[in-house]
Design a protein with these regions (language model features):
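N-terminal secretory signal peptides that target proteins for export/translocation
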Residues: 1-19
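Residue-level detector of alpha-helix initiation sites
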Residues: 137-138
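Rhodanese-like catalytic fold shared by cysteine-dependent sulfurtransferases
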Residues: 2, 9, 23-82, 101-128, ...
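Short, polar loop motifs at secondary-structure junctions
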Residues: 94-99
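Structural scaffold elements adjacent to functional motifs in cytosolic proteins
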Residues: 89-93
Length: 207
């Protein structure tokens, strides 16, 4: 590449050297596109109105963001729990203490923070499967991915988590007794939980 300059009469020298195209605009455009795609993907969780969350959209979101996390169905988990042998997994409830206090899966232990979750998993053999769950599977998929990065194997997320489990009429416990309610997490996410499973106080809060 060489410079080409010309003197125009009565004016300054003009440089016609070819200029490499700047990459700033393409990079900026690509960044905006990626952000836009992520925003659109997240919006697909909602169908129609902001409160109309669908299960299919939630499952798609989880698969998109945590494809490395294996999913276990509520049916398979129930079968493993009933077998009561080495296939019975360690159940970790990663919701808040308040949510866990309303109800949880039988035998599940509560561990909300990353350190608590890691500590709970270390107390069991590496050969024992670990199943984590939350309300619908978003928080627990994130927790499962973190456990896997720490080196833990045989980790699963409960697909649909406690909402789907309860919607199917499967057993729930609280303070050692069977219950039939689940913390709805929030008004928006609570639409995925059958209305008869909402605690009375939660229903009042949503009115």
């Amino acid at each position: 590449m060489f410079a080409q300059t010309f003197k125009m009469r009565g004016k300054r020298t003009v440089d016609f050297t070819p200029v490499r195209p700047r990459r700033t605009l393409p990079l900026l455009a690509a960044s905006v596109l990626l952000i836009g795609q992520a925003w659109i993907a997240d919006r697909t969780v909602y169908s129609g109105t902001k409160d109309a969350i669908t299960w299919s959209a939630v499952f798609t979101w989880i698969q998109r963001d945590w494809p490395q996390v294996a999913q276990i169905s509520t049916r398979e988990l129930a079968e493993r729990m009933a077998a009561g042998n080495e296939s019975a997994p360690l159940l970790i409830d990663v919701r808040t203490r308040e949510e866990y206090g309303v109800s949880h899966l039988p035998g599940a232990i509560w561990a909300e923070t990353p350190d608590q979750i890691a500590s709970a998993s270390r107390e069991r053999s590496d050969r024992q499967p670990v199943v984590v769950y939350c309300s619908v599977g978003v928080r627990s998929s994130k927790a499962a991915a973190r456990l896997m990065r720490s080196g833990r194997t045989n980790v699963f997320n409960l697909q649909g988590s406690i909402f789907k489990w309860a919607n199917e009429g499967r057993p729930l416990m609280a303070n050692g007794s069977a219950v039939h309610v689940v913390h709805p997490y929030s008004e928006r996410w609570g639409v995925l939980l059958d209305s008869q499973l909402h605690p009375p106080q939660a229903e009042k809060a949503m009115d």
